[in-house]
């Protein structure tokens, strides 16, 4: 659902997430705020809220157990979202995570995939994903630490020159605290349905999930405690609007979260039934 103001910010209290894991709780595209699929609230609501984000209720807030399987696309046994967010090319997207544990250091990566038709009926593993943003380790600091310092939020720009259409946006954090073991890297992916408008024509080449990440990739099988001086972010280089070249966006950590500092303490109670009534008008419905 789309909330009418930042006061709907539904980041869960830290006590809700006793385990050291996390999910995206909210997404903002420019000034439009959407509550994400909430794994510990939505399954017990009646009716279950419709979201723009794909749900993975059975997986909780933990990582994908095996990133060589289809679970790496949109998380474990992900189910298609009912709603679609209308987003302009060139918009700023801000992802708000639940309280992220400091020990879970690693990169952040975001991809887009053109669904061709309706993203709500597509097999996400059949799509081609092009990276639009990533950030990792720079000047001795992990991007995950910057995200924590910015109210557990991260911002990036939707490429302004991509062709309009229906897209999945795939956003993930990768925790590397156990990545010294094979399959020890912890991926936390999620997907959301977008309808991107604009006058662009770019259709960048992409990669497949699963397949884009290998067990022995330098940025996946790595010991971050062993004198790390540099880090290679997994996957391709990000598409840079207008040129097709890469663009490391480590500086894109969101400061927007500071606009509503009190909202970070808002519990799931903020997701009152009345807000659910606004969802049909706030996002594209199944009829769109």
From Swiss-Prot:
> Where along the chain is O2 bound?
177, 186
The UniProt record lists the keyword Cytoplasm:
no
Catalytic reactions of this protein: [(1->4)-beta-D-glucosyl]n+m + reduced acceptor + O2 = 4-dehydro-beta-D-glucosyl-[(1->4)-beta-D-glucosyl]n-1 + [(1->4)-beta-D-glucosyl]m + acceptor + H2O
What name does this protein carry? Answer: AA9 family lytic polysaccharide monooxygenase A
Species, as recorded: Geotrichum candidum (Oospora lactis)
Query: Can you tell me which residues bind Cu(2+)?
Result: 21, 104, 188
Superkingdom of the source species: Eukaryota
Keyword set, alphabetical order:
Carbohydrate metabolism, Cellulose degradation, Copper, Disulfide bond, Glycoprotein, Metal-binding, Monooxygenase, Oxidoreductase, Polysaccharide degradation, Secreted, Signal
Record-linked Pfam families: AA9
Where composition is biased (Low complexity), the residues are 249-270
